[in-house]
């Protein structure tokens, strides 16, 4: 169940070690980098105005039981930052997957799964390709979206 709160004050909302899975999509860009969004809510969502990778992983560490899993998506240029911070908080990166729009394109996102208290071993999985050359979803993306994909491709063309 999604819960909206300030993750920097997560202890005010939840007890420590109360979850076996935590997922996060933290802001991608440090403040004062790239083109900052004009709207305040978009700026907060995209830039590390209110939280950063360290805040996100620290909150996940607090929430996770020993052996619990942490999943996060982020931009490839922040990969080293994310993996370093995960290890700093004893969440060992276990699976890594890059995401690209079409085959043979540079990834625009990565998905990482870590396990609290685990031993080192990172498995890099095949790249997740979103679209076929004709612009339609790949079979794997159709599996991900399921019935939500019905008619979506026609709306974006």
Predicted regions and their residues:
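Structural signature of beta-strand start/N-cap positions in the alpha/beta core
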Residues: 1, 18-20
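Glycine/Thr-rich phosphate-binding loops of Rossmann-like dinucleotide-binding domains
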Residues: 11, 32, 80
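Mobile active-site "lid"/loop adjacent to the S-adenosyl-L-methionine
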Residues: 20-21, 26-55
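Short, glycine/acidic-enriched loop or turn micro-motifs at the edges of active sites
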Residues: 9, 28, 116
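Conserved Class I SAM-dependent methyltransferase catalytic core
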Residues: 49-107, 111
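SAM/dcSAM-binding transferase cores
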Residues: 106-157
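Conserved SAM-binding strand-loop segment of SAM-dependent methyltransferases
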Residues: 1-12
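Glycine-rich phosphate-binding loop signature in dinucleotide/nucleotide-binding domains
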Residues: 13-17
């Amino acid at each position: 169940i999604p819960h909206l709160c300030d993750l920097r004050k997560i202890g005010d909302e939840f007890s420590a070690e109360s979850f076996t899975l935590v997922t996060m999509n933290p802001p991608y860009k440090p403040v004062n980098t790239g083109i900052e969004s004009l709207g305040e809510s978009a700026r907060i969502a995209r830039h590390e105005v209110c939280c950063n990778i360290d805040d996100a992983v620290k909150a996940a560490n607090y929430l996770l039981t020993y052996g619990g899993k942490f999943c996060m998506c982020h931009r490839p240029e922040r990969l080293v930052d994310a993996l370093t911070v995960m290890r700093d908080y004893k969440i060992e990166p276990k699976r890594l997957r890059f995401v690209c729009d079409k085959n043979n394109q540079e990834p625009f996102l990565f998905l990482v799964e870590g396990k609290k208290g685990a031993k080192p071993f990172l498995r890099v999985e095949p790249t997740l390709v979103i679209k076929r050359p004709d612009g339609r979803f790949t079979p794997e993306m159709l599996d991900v979206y399921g019935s939500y994909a019905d008619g979506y491709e026609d709306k974006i063309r």
